[in-house]
Amino acid sequence: KSYAEWMVRQQWQKWNVDAYFPMNYNDFYLRGPKWVGRVTREEVETAGGKPVYSGLFICHDWENKRGDIDPENSGLVPSEIAAAVQAAREAGAAGICLFCPSHMTEAHWAEFDKAIGLK
């Protein structure tokens, strides 16, 4: 089974969509940011030529992440952004989407800009 089918019971090969925006929440599966590449590669293969925009889950209170057990405070901290973006690109993602952009702090945006080549 694909990650999508195994993890969230989604059978993409049966969908008629223009693009995919999977929520690649590495922390939910106790994986580091490079896991995004592994799952994105499979998503690209499953998508049958349609674009995949790898969804990155952003930690909104990243300075207190280590002491918080709430899964809603999971996600990428600024220092992990570059590894996740690079892994998704190398795996064939057409782009990146952010869940949730409102969680992005100045530090997240600075690292994101570097990761996509704006700085």
Describe the predicted segments one by one.
Residues 4-6, 36, 81:
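Amphipathic coiled-coil/heptad-repeat helices and related helical stalk/stem segments
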Residues 39:
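Amphipathic alpha-helical interface segments
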Residues 15-33, 42, 50-119:
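Substrate-binding cleft of secreted/luminal carbohydrate-active enzymes
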Residues 1-13:
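Distinct, well-ordered alpha-helical segments
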